[in-house]
Amino acid sequence: MRFTLVGNGRMGQQVALVIAQSGCHETAAVLDINTAITPDLFQGSDAIIDFTVREAFFANLPAMLESGVPIVVGTTGWDDLRDEIEVKVSDAGASLLYSANFSLGVNIFLRTVREAARLIAPFGQFDIAFAEQHHTAKADFPSGTALRAADMILSANSRKKSVVRQLSDDKKLAPDELQVASLRLGSVFGKHSAFIDSDADEIVISHTAKSRSGFAAGAVEAAIWLARRHTTAPGFYTMDDFLNETFS
């Protein structure tokens, strides 16, 4: 397969390395911040992989959709406009797969957290919170992965109704609020943890990324899956769609 990469930052470079090391795929083009994105730049590619920033993603999306090439998006920070993006994808008859984190390990972790949140739901003595750590260059917080985890916890545990991203000096956390804490430190690739606490014990479920290679490899695998699916079932997909089919 031939891939066009949009974004030449740390993740874009890691994706290019994974493709080069595969022995069976190739990078058709790498488009960076200085490239004027037009639909013709994607012709001859089987899939687009986008790792940019929110503003660049929105600016480039019309051209990517018009190209008709399946799009895998790892750019985060636009969850508030997801409904709008889904409509654009549908109207264009395009295929787009979005994930805040393409790591297989992270996605196994998220499913474990969701199951733990479900299991403790009937037992009021257990409380749950979530925390994430990333390098100081990461622009958005909480991370997209943390927000995804929060959605999964809320859907699995009816005792938690809303997410609190930052605590204030004059307000206590309500029992039905889920705290999602963020820490920016050094060059941390990414660490996510769910904390479950009672008077008797504490359960901690964590995932720590050792490098960006897992994220990049997952993005490439998702792009291969999306390219195959695009011919018969275009649409808006998530990593869950890919994994549900893979794990079945």
Curated annotation (Swiss-Prot):
It catalyses: (S)-2,3,4,5-tetrahydrodipicolinate + NAD(+) + H2O = (2S,4S)-4-hydroxy-2,3,4,5-tetrahydrodipicolinate + NADH + H(+); (S)-2,3,4,5-tetrahydrodipicolinate + NADP(+) + H2O = (2S,4S)-4-hydroxy-2,3,4,5-tetrahydrodipicolinate + NADPH + H(+). One of its GO terms (cellular component) is cytosol. Signal peptide: none annotated. Transmembrane segments: none annotated. Its main location: cytoplasm. Its EC number is 1.17.1.8. One of its GO terms (biological process) is lysine biosynthetic process via diaminopimelate. NAD(+) binds at D32, G74, T75, T76, S99, A100, N101, F102. It comes from the Bacteria. It is an enzyme of class 1 (oxidoreductase). Pfam families: DapB_C, DapB_N. The keyword Ubl conjugation does not apply. GO terms for molecular function: 4-hydroxy-tetrahydrodipicolinate reductase; NAD binding; NADP binding; oxidoreductase activity, acting on CH or CH2 groups, NAD or NADP as acceptor. (S)-2,3,4,5-tetrahydrodipicolinate binds at H135, G144, T145. Pathway: Amino-acid biosynthesis; L-lysine biosynthesis via DAP pathway; (S)-tetrahydrodipicolinate from L-aspartate: step 4/4. Keywords: Amino-acid biosynthesis, Cytoplasm, Diaminopimelate biosynthesis, Lysine biosynthesis, NAD, NADP, Oxidoreductase. The keyword Chloroplast does not apply. Belongs to the DapB family. PANTHER family: 4-HYDROXY-TETRAHYDRODIPICOLINATE REDUCTASE 1, CHLOROPLASTIC-RELATED (PTHR20836:SF0), DIHYDRODIPICOLINATE REDUCTASE (PTHR20836). NCBIfam families: dapB. HAMAP family: DapB (MF_00102). Catalyzes the conversion of 4-hydroxy-tetrahydrodipicolinate (HTPA) to tetrahydrodipicolinate. This is 4-hydroxy-tetrahydrodipicolinate reductase. It comes from Pelodictyon phaeoclathratiforme (strain DSM 5477 / BU-1).
